[in-house]
Amino acid sequence: MTKTELKPILVFDSGIGGLTVLREARVLMPERHFIYVADDAGFPYGGWEEGALKERVIALFGRLLAELDPEICIIACNTAFTLVGADLRAAYPQMTFVGTVPAIKPAAERTRSGLVSVLATPGTVKRAYTRDLIQSFASQCHVRLVGSENLARMAEAYIRGDALADEAVLAEIEPCFVEAEGKRTDIVVLACTHYPFMSNVFRRLAPWPVDWLDPAEAIARRARSLVPLPNGFEPLNGEDPAIFTSGRPDFATRRLMQGFGLRVMADAVSADRRERI
């Protein structure tokens, strides 16, 4: 398989949080081109009704797979994958989907206090998938689920360079910090790919030090294990394409994409198709 024959890797998120996963995946798969897809027309996913979101994502992937023909798809969005992952695999059995789920298992393995918090969107918190992970891997721990209504939007603003009030951020993360029977929360799972961009802010504002668990590297390792590595490959240079379902990313977003080595495609998903999403 030559370099020109290698199919790209599709990285999908509701917004720009999936860039945390893209960054790690590029390190592990330097021989591949990537296509970043942001469903910003539907952002944020956390407040969507489940049936409507499921229908939207499945239909969108039907078009993306037909047009882009990727090697695999990385769903860099906890909210989407915990809801739609099984349905995507059933609808498109020829495609390999690498999912993003709350990193509850590694958190349970690392905690010393037994107090773990999961910072997520409301959608991820209410999924049976998330509670099944807790039952399967963290039944011996006290796991607090914290569903933030605002933090994904705040993270998008922060990534674009907007200033955020410390008090507003603290109000979102403070419920993660639990004290019980002389013990304290020692791990917070970042169960939204937007949140790691704000990890330094979280550390600065945290009532006490904790391990902020970012799953991006583990997701990238899983993807690498599923993608064939050709002999004699050379690392690729140049920009990769980015697709926004709104077709209208603002200037700050375009500049951010350039910083990640991405160029925004003007007409990768045609307007008439977007209207039917």
From Swiss-Prot:
**The keyword Zinc appears for this protein:** no
Described purpose of this protein according to its UniProt entry: Provides the (R)-glutamate required for cell wall biosynthesis.
Indicate the family of this protein.
Answer: Belongs to the aspartate/glutamate racemases family.
Catalytic activity from the UniProt record: L-glutamate = D-glutamate
Where are the active-site residues found?
77, 192
Single Gene Ontology BP annotation: cell wall organization
Please indicate if the UniProt record lists Cell wall biogenesis/degradation as a keyword.
yes
Question: Main EC class of this protein?
Answer: isomerase
> What protein name applies here?
Glutamate racemase
Question: Which residues bind substrate per the record?
Answer: 13-14, 45-46, 78-79, 193-194
E.C. code = 5.1.1.3
A GO molecular function assigned to this protein is: glutamate racemase activity
Pfam families in the record, alphabetically?
Answer: Asp_Glu_race
By its UniProt entry, which Gene3D superfamilies does this protein fall under? 3.40.50.1860
Could you tell me the superkingdom of the organism this chain comes from?
Bacteria
| Pathway it works in | Cell wall biogenesis; peptidoglycan biosynthesis
Q: Which gene encodes it?
A: murI
Keywords from the named record: Cell shape, Cell wall biogenesis/degradation, Isomerase, Peptidoglycan synthesis
